Amino acid sequence: MDTIGYHYVVEAAGCDPEVIADPNKIREIFLEAAKVGNMEVKASYFFKFSPMGVSGVVIVAESHISVHTWPEKGYAALDVYTCGEKADPEKAVDYILEKFKAKYAHVSELKRGIEEEDSTFTHTILTWEEKLDRRNGNK
């Protein structure tokens, strides 16, 4: 079966706590990430927890971008899932990590789509730590 979509599951650490504690800032980042990744925004919702933390989602025609943050730990759990040919989820992920000022990230890329007659499917694990280290001036 052809791939239906690409799902990036991202562990982002060393993020700027002020950025990932602000639902309005995250919404702004996600809306721009959708544009950078050539996605069509349909809706968005973000919720700020007390005393801290944000969960949110941007629904795009191609699927979604979502987040759960722990500012006290500098940590964000991100999902970027797209289907179709025109979207570039990797660009969206890279943009979000840059704006979150993530120092470390583990990115798992899952090729989505399996039919009943398919007996196996594979997932590829990617790590972008080296790229983040270079961007943060550590190499």
Curated annotation (Swiss-Prot):
It catalyses: S-adenosyl-L-methionine + H(+) = S-adenosyl 3-(methylsulfanyl)propylamine + CO2. One of its GO terms (biological process) is spermidine biosynthetic process. Its EC number is 4.1.1.50. Heterotetramer of two alpha and two beta chains arranged as a dimer of alpha/beta heterodimers. InterPro entries: AdoMetDC_C (IPR042286), AdoMetDC_fam_prok (IPR003826), AdoMetDC_N (IPR042284), S-AdoMet_deCO2ase_core (IPR016067), S-AdoMet_deCOase_pro-enz (IPR017716). Belongs to the prokaryotic AdoMetDC family. Type 1 subfamily. It comes from Pyrococcus furiosus (strain ATCC 43587 / DSM 3638 / JCM 8422 / Vc1). This is S-adenosylmethionine decarboxylase proenzyme. One of its GO terms (molecular function) is adenosylmethionine decarboxylase activity. Binds 1 pyruvoyl group covalently per subunit. Keywords: Autocatalytic cleavage, Decarboxylase, Lyase, Polyamine biosynthesis, Pyruvate, S-adenosyl-L-methionine, Schiff base, Spermidine biosynthesis, Zymogen. The active site is at residues 63, 68, 83. The modification Pyruvic acid (Ser) is found at residue 63. Transmembrane segments: none annotated. SUPFAM superfamilies: S-adenosylmethionine decarboxylase. The gene is speH. The record marks 62-63 as: Cleavage (non-hydrolytic). Pathway: Amine and polyamine biosynthesis; S-adenosylmethioninamine biosynthesis; S-adenosylmethioninamine from S-adenosyl-L-methionine: step 1/1.
